[in-house]
Amino acid sequence: MKKNLYIILLSFIAIAVYADNRQGIDFYKAGEPTIASWLFEKQLSSSPAEQAEALYYLGEIAFDENKTFEALANYQKGWTTFPDYAYNKVGEGKVLLKTDKSTAQKAFDAAIKINKKDASVYVAIAKAYSMNGMEAEAQAALDNAKKYNANDPAIYLYEGDLLISKDKPGGAAGRYEQAIHFDPACKEAYIKYANVYQGVTPTLSIEMLQKVISNYPDYLPAYCHLGNIYSLQGNYPKAVAAYKTYMAGGLYSTDNLVHYASALFFNKQYAESGKIISEGQAIDPDNFLLKRLAIYNDYESKAYEKGLEEIETFFNNPDAKYIWQDYLYYGRLLNKAKQYDQAADALQKAIKESSSHTEIYKDLAEVYSNSENNAEAIKAYTQYIEALGEESEAADYYQLGKYYYTAAAKDSIAAQKYLFKADSLFAIVKERVPDSHLGSLWQARTQSQLDPETEQGLAKPYYESCIPILEKNKEKYSNELTECYRYLGYYYYLKQDMDNSKIYWNKILSIDPSNATAQEALKNIK
């Protein structure tokens, strides 16, 4: 926890001193106990009333972490410091219910005695009973809360939480809305409502968070939750914007840094992501998630040597739980280091972890191609396209066609079979993207390999169909046009059609006046 708090201590220079516990309570109730704990500790030198409240919440944080002795000590110290703050007695009773129900009940009675009509205290007691499986007693306490103030939002927060524990999110959301209805300033209810729908109907979560932000623009936890939901949606630009606002408040933990860096990474802001990762690792160098993210970011930033060094250390943790992306990036880094056998092994492990992620097959094909294992490259890329199904694109067939084309050059026995397959794939490219020259051009190249002496002119119609597309941008496609003109010039030369042959050699000179091949051909024709 100290590591997680260090960043907050650094940030304190830039933020105001907090006069009460309100911000700590906001962070605690929004699910940020690390930040809340630091804020409460800063209040332990304030007034007795503020100290008592801070100690109660420090007790709650300890209780949530199953540190019951620490929790009890905080509750009891809080009660001694300021006996008018009832909740410390509720906390004490909550801990004692497990071992001494009679003493626990006395603690609850002492809390109630301070203000017998405080509905929120009864709700806290109900929660204590419920957490210990004493449902009848919990209901009795809740009934008292409703008797004294049926409009207290704490009632509906408690009921919503109970419904969540019973896997009834719809009912829970309704209770949280009631809490907001009775107290529009109940910021915790907005967060809880957003949490209900974030994985189901995130638009409702976003609307609720935007509502609380509109009413309370300084309520920092809402921005963090908003960033989390946008990240879950894959809307990384908005996630980055929300996290940036949250971080500007100066109160954040390493967990928050992980989320922010992740959003930047997935938004392809690798330089910015790297800075946040470095900030987090300066605080917590052993943070596993930051180590993982640093490796991914190294690869995407083209820091391949650094990434490979880091990932080899990363995989030396016997207790770590690795995921398929870890092996994917290991394979990618090994591929860049030209360690192809090890790269293939790493990618096979990635497939074993999650065969449904199609991009692994694509990377595996590249590794096999780089190692000139063309048959395996073809096999892996075919699996990639098959896994994509209807989502496959022209570019996918184009790449597979190129793998077959390359394989033909390396295997004279199977060359014709590979070239026929390449041609069929390039035909798909031409059909899917008729305005592109690539399908026809590569069909021409493939047919040229099937007719290396240009005796049959198999490539002729394909080169001819490329020219109108390429001539729309002669400067960009000068090399491709030269290839087309050269083939056709030579074809007509072989056919003794010198007039047409000269046309194409001159076309080459029109875009490349110093082209030696065209100049020599024209000399021979004359």
How should these model regions be labeled?
Residues A16-L494, T517-K526:
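Alpha-solenoid helical repeat scaffolds
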Residues M1-K2, E177:
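N-terminal hydrophobic targeting signals that begin at the initiator methionine
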Residues K2, Y18-A19, P513:
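Intrinsically disordered, low-complexity peptide-like regions
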Residues M498-P513, L522-N524:
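C-terminal interaction modules of eukaryotic adaptor/scaffold proteins
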